[in-house]
Amino acid sequence: MSAATITLLFLLFAVVMFVFEKIPLGVTSMIVCIGLVVTGVLDVKTAFAGFIDSNVILFVAMFIVGGALFETGMANKIGGIVTHFAKSERSLIVAIMSIVGLMSGVLSNTGTAAVLIPVVIGIAAKSGYARSKLLMPLVFAAAMGGNLSLIGAPGNLIAQSALGEIGMSFGFFEYAIVGLPILAAGILFYATLGMKLLPNHPVSDDDAFSGEQDFNNVPKWKQVLSLVILVLTLLGMIFEKQIGIKLNIIGCIGALALILTGVISEKDALKSIDLKTIFLFGGTLSLASALDKTGAGAEIANIVIGALGENPSPYVLTLVVFLLCCVMTNFMSNTATTALMVPICLSIAQGMGADPRAVLMACVIGGSCAYATPIGMPANTMVVSAGGYSFKDYAKAGLPLILIATVVSMVILPIAFPFFPQ
């Protein structure tokens, strides 16, 4: 049995186990991770590389930064201020998604989510609304916001690089031609019909970020300093390129500053790290690596694209590429999905004599639609435990958003980027 076939079998196993959740999600991820080593698909170093992935390091750091906001009561104070202005659940969803979406357009969507997750949990605690109904719109908005500018997500730059090789390019905000209507439609959906699809889970008793605490005895300087360090961490992420320090390291500096200044104790810092999230994300990265390294992902793409024939309609090609990227990105990283699909799409479009921009943008936008699984993007995984989400929760709330993104994209792309411009 080939390595690619074994990988696809592990993918099938993971999907089934994630859907029915007979065993915890993190345990399923570790079974896949270890299974890929035992079967010889991956070596130990590659299989476990996910646990030192930059996103995992960022998770750990931001769990501590978020933990400090809760331990000091600052998250609740911020929540009280926000709920004073946004009094209904609907207005909170609109406000959160709008702020996160716009921030994510110029910042890392993972970084944006990591900074704002503890704030939103504080808002939920103060307002009395279920955090599960606020966190999922937050991470979805972070993904949609990545399609507002050239630097919003790594996949955007991959397509830009491919276009550059044939003397074409996207403008800095050209992605927003499609991305902004999708963000607006997504916000409108979750503020209306989609509200009923958002999960409504109570906070678990063992939750590290419980808002039911007495903060009267916490020194005010700790509250102020926790907020100052959060703001400085956010500023560091905004100016990541200028200062030359990676997001995950900026997060680590913030976490260390909180511990060294005594804002949060080492014990509370360790308690705030959600190991279930770490095991889920780190373990499933091995599956993403296997899909990439064995060529299993490429096989799927080639089979689907090949089924279209030698001269497919550019409209059909764009739709199929979009949907294929949507499916793949929910199990592989969106960067890997885009990197895999962009050369294939560019080659086919050029062979047809069509302008490749619509197809490439379909590839990038589709590759960002990781809304249907908890492993589709790092931000999804970060809120699994805090929101008490299951695999089915993501599918129920996320699949309609994929449908909305598909319809919006298929209407706008051929108009904004004609296949055969005059």
Located regions from the model:
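Juxtamembrane and boundary regions of transmembrane helices in multi-pass small-molecule transporters
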Residues: 6, 91, 126-140, 145-158, ...
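Hydrophobic alpha-helical membrane segments of integral membrane proteins
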Residues: 27-32, 109-117, 136-137, 148-152, ...
